[in-house]
Amino acid sequence: MFLGTYTPRLDEKSRLILPAKFREELAEGLVLTRGQERCIYVFSAREFERVHEQMRSAPLSSRQARDYIRVFLSGASDEVPDKQGRVTVPAPLRQYAGLDRDVTVIGAGTRVEIWDSESWNTYLAEQEAAFSETDEDVLPGVF
């Protein structure tokens, strides 16, 4: 499970050093793709296979499903981290997420998300205001 918030920087070759706690699960390979709210989703190769299998069950007769799957998969890039735990973030994904050098990497359970740090801080400030009031509405019975 991926947890926590980290603030690495992209190097001059657009490589991201993965947080040490994430490296073991991602060492065999990972997939980066477009995420919601203009972030990049990072899945382990195994988890991405599971996500893809769920997508395959979507009805091809649904234009909305086809459109989503096209955008999601066409932006995907499979990568293998190097021995130092670095992974290159492809230019189209950097552009999509507005990444420069300062990034925020968050653990989101089954995936990692890479955010432009300023965008993450803005998003978090907007969401924290309502956070304590929404737990029962969004996740009934969890807390």
From Swiss-Prot:
Single GO biological process annotation from the record: negative regulation of DNA-templated transcription initiation
Classification via InterPro entries: MraZ, MraZ_C, MraZ_dom, MraZ_N, MraZ_sf, SpoVT-AbrB_dom, SpoVT-AbrB_sf
Subcellular location: Cytoplasm, Nucleoid
Chief location of this protein within or outside the cell: cytoplasm
GO molecular function, one term: transcription cis-regulatory region binding
Superkingdom field: Bacteria
Keywords: Cytoplasm, DNA-binding, Repeat, Transcription, Transcription regulation
Record-linked Pfam families: MraZ
Sequence ranges assigned to domain SpoVT-AbrB in this UniProt record: 5-47, 76-119
GO cellular component labels: cytoplasm; nucleoid
Transcription keyword on record: yes
Oligomeric and partner information: Forms oligomers.
Record family assignment: Belongs to the MraZ family.
HAMAP family per record: MraZ (MF_01008)
This protein's name: Transcriptional regulator MraZ
